């Protein structure tokens, strides 16, 4: 019988790609999502892409803070593990609305952990983030690097990591893997699912794709005087399909009897500048991206990229795709879905 996995936030960007990989890997997936920053359209497309495997997918519109609704789902299915993506994730908004972020992300997680314990499901993969490294003094960031988030969003990730460690310390039956991932980019090679941010994109590449399809006039590059090869900020961009595979590898690792509460970086181990990413996208799409140069944004780190040795060694996982593949698949998604899953804006059908 297929192993059954609960995926919170499974309608989101990384969640939907991971759900597809779960189904294709022989798992059954139950998704809970409140659709605050996603839509059910992504899961309908996942179901289609998965073909017959799509029969092993079900999804429910549930907020993790709604304990009775969560208990009902746990009472109906015996889960082997939970992959926890759900959470608000805009850095700027978190600064403006910290209590919203603490309530949604932390209270939601605590409720989830309580219900998991209540129903005897103590296997968890948590989506943390490289944002917990703050402004790293040294790169690459290893799992032992100091952690100090610089905004409320990052602090919710950091606090949830600590909560997970405390839960494991109190009960050694728990097996928890914390995945700190870097900058996800790209889309499923089919171009049928991808990133569809609501409102103004917070990250570089979704913004670039909206410029390319004519939804925005130009890209503003914040900071051109960093001590980097071209003066722009450097990040570790990772293909979303590699990231999805990393979650499957983490799920398999939970079967290891020696696992307690472990942290793994998921990145490529390579730093790429803003201008290098834009150039790679221009090459993949054949589109010129107009740029406006601006000063640094407060809080932006200069260079952040991952040490990936631990994940390679212990999860037997390594990112396969480079920035060319990321940009190719991103453009395939964007050009086929210029308005994302919202078909009403461009007159096409989902």
Curated annotation (Swiss-Prot):
Give residues annotated as binding NAD(+).
12-14, 33-37, 63-64, 85, 89, 157, 181
| Keyword Glycoprotein annotated | no
Q: How does activity depend on pH?
A: Optimum pH is 7.0-9.0.
Tissue note = Widely expressed. Most highly expressed in stems and flowers.
Q: Which EC number applies? A: 5.1.3.2
Quote the temperature dependence note: Optimum temperature is 40 degrees Celsius.
- From the Swiss-Prot or TrEMBL record, give the protein name: UDP-glucose 4-epimerase 2
The UniProt catalytic activity note for this protein reads: UDP-alpha-D-glucose = UDP-alpha-D-galactose
Q: Which UniProt keywords apply?
A: Carbohydrate metabolism, Cell wall biogenesis/degradation, Cytoplasm, Galactose metabolism, Isomerase, NAD
Q: What activates or inhibits this protein?
A: Enhanced activity by NaCl. Enhanced activity by NAD(+). Strongly inhibited by UDP.
User: What does the entry give for GO biological process?
Assistant: cell wall biogenesis; cell wall organization; galactose metabolic process
Chain positions recorded as substrate binding sites: 129-131, 181-183, 202-204, 220-222, 235, 297-300
Pathway(s) it belongs to: Carbohydrate metabolism; galactose metabolism
Gene name?
A: UGE2
């Amino acid at each position: 019988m297929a192993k059954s996995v609960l995926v919170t936030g499974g309608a989101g960007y990384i969640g939907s790609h991971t759900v597809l990989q779960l189904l294709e890997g022989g798992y059954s997936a139950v998704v809970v999502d409140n659709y605050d920053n996603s839509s059910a359209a992504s899961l309908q497309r996942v179901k289609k892409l998965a073909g017959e495997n799509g029969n092993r997918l079900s999804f429910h519109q549930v907020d993790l803070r709604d304990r009775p609704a969560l208990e009902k789902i746990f009472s109906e299915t015996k889960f082997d593990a939970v992959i926890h993506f759900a959470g608000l994730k805009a850095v700027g908004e978190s600064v403006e609305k910290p209590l919203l972020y603490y309530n949604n992300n932390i209270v939601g997680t605590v409720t989830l952990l309580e219900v998991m314990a209540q129903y005897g499901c103590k296997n968890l993969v948590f989506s943390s983030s490289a944002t917990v490294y703050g402004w790293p003094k040294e790169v690459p960031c290893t799992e032992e690097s100091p952690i100090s988030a610089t905004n409320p969003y990052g602090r919710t990730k950091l606090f949830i990591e600590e909560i997970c460690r405390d839960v494991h310390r109190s009960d050694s039956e728990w097996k928890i893997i914390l995945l700190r991932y870097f900058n996800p980019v790209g889309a499923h090679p089919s171009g049928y699912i991808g990133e569809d941010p609501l409102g103004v994109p917070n990250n570089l590449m979704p913004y670039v794709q909206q410029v390319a399809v004519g939804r925005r006039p130009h890209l503003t590059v914040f900071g051109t005087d960093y001590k980097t090869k071209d003066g722009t900020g450097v990040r570790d961009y990772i293909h979303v399909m590699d990231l999805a595979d990393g979650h499957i590898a983490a799920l398999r690792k939970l079967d290891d009897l020696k696992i307690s509460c472990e942290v793994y970086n998921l990145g490529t181990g390579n730093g790429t500048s803003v201008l290098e990413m834009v150039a790679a996208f221009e090459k993949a799409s054949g589109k010129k991206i107009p740029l406006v140069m601006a000063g640094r944004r407060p809080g932006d780190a200069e260079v952040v990229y991952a040490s990936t040795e631990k994940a390679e060694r212990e999860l037997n996982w390594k990112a396969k795709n480079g920035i060319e593949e990321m940009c190719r698949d991103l453009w395939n998604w964007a050009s086929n879905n210029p308005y994302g899953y919202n078909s009403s804006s461009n007159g096409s059908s989902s």
